[in-house]
């Protein structure tokens, strides 16, 4: 078994078979990253392939863009997802558009890794989940892993993809799954998705994972909230499908529609604020495709429409109780 940190090191090592793959960002070289996800990689692969950058997210992204359109496959790290916004112009206006702008002559195989979400008492600027700010941008692919196993498979697919990929990593899950209890810090040692093969394997971008199978409600989530939903379903006593979306763009429409058509009920759970969150896009898409099969309104359990708080973090993040309440409401109709 291994942690997400160890998995990340294995994945980059595995992808290093392609000498065009390089990794850089703030503190990722000598120090091994603020969460130690690149620990030992510089020593193994050399300073020319794993190196530190200045504290400039815009500069990191711009450098990766130039490298990408000239034949390299950069894997960059934005130290926290909250810090990605100085790089927004380079990601949205350059990386995402170069294939279309050049008529397919150029492409930009850049993977942008960034720790996201709450659960570490990071306050306003170390806790956000800004995935919906990128799912709205044509030309980008957006991934949000949840376990060591899918983190490796998805990251290899992202690195080998010819388009830019935003790869969100739930920082609360680096050392173990998060079931919603801030006082309990489990490790990955006993989780079935913690076993990470040493061999090269990929999980296709756009494929969801059916984590739990049931027949009375469909619960959809991604990142750390997948484990919160797992706990909620267990405690609710309601038979539910739990879908770990894994990739938000493109998302697995077929798997979701098949499940909601079967259960007739749906709960979508994410950490980001409710208004204009990706759950709203999913709810609209599900309603368009499953209207005649829905037995109750689609429920969303999300963060609140406020900046991420520090002292009341556990009231902000969706917990099992809120998810259970939503599941029960779907059964009352």
Predicted stretch roles:
Residues 48, 55-59, 65-220, 226-228, ...:
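Conserved thiamine diphosphate
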Residues 13-40:
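N-terminal glycine-rich anion-binding loops that anchor highly charged ligand groups
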Residues 1-8, 12:
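Single conserved hydrophobic/aromatic residue that forms the stacking wall/gate
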Residues 14, 63, 154-158, 258-259, ...:
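CheY-like receiver
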């Amino acid at each position: 078994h291994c942690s997400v940190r160890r998995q990340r090191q294995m994945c980059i090592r595995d992808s290093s078979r392609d000498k065009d793959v390089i990794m850089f960002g703030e503190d990722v070289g000598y120090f091994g990253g603020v969460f130690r996800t690149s620990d030992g990689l510089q020593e193994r692969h050399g300073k020319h392939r794993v190196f530190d950058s200045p504290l400039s997210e815009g500069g990191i992204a711009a450098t990766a863009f130039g490298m990408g359109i000239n034949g390299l496959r950069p894997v960059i790290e934005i130290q926290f997802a909250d810090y990605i916004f100085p790089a927004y112009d380079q990601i949205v206006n350059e990386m995402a558009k170069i294939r279309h702008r050049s008529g397919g002559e150029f492409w930009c195989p850049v993977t942008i890794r960034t720790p996201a979400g709450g659960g570490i008492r990071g306050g306003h600027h170390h806790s956000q989940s800004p995935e919906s700010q990128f799912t709205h941008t044509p030309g980008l692919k957006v991934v949000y892993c949840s376990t060591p196993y899918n983190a490796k498979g998805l990251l290899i697919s992202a690195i080998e993809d010819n388009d830019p990929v935003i790869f969100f990593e739930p920082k609360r899950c680096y050392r173990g799954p998060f079931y919603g209890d801030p006082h309990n810090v489990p490790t990955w040692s006993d989780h079935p998705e913690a076993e990470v093969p040493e061999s090269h394997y990929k999980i296709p971008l756009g494929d969801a994972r059916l984590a739990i199978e049931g027949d009375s409600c469909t619960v959809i989530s991604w990142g750390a909230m997948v484990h919160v939903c797992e706990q909620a379903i267990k405690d609710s006593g309601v038979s539910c499908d739990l879908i770990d979306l894994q990739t938000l763009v493109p998302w697995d429409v077929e798997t979701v529609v098949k499940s909601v058509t079967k259960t007739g009920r749906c709960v979508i759970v994410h950490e980001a604020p409710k208004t204009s969150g990706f759950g709203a896009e999913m709810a609209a898409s599900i309603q368009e495709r499953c209207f005649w099969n829905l037995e109750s309104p689609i429920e969303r359990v999300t963060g609140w429409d406020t900046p991420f708080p520090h002292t009341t973090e556990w009231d902000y993040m969706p917990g099992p109780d809120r998810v259970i309440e939503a599941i029960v409401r779907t059964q009352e109709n």
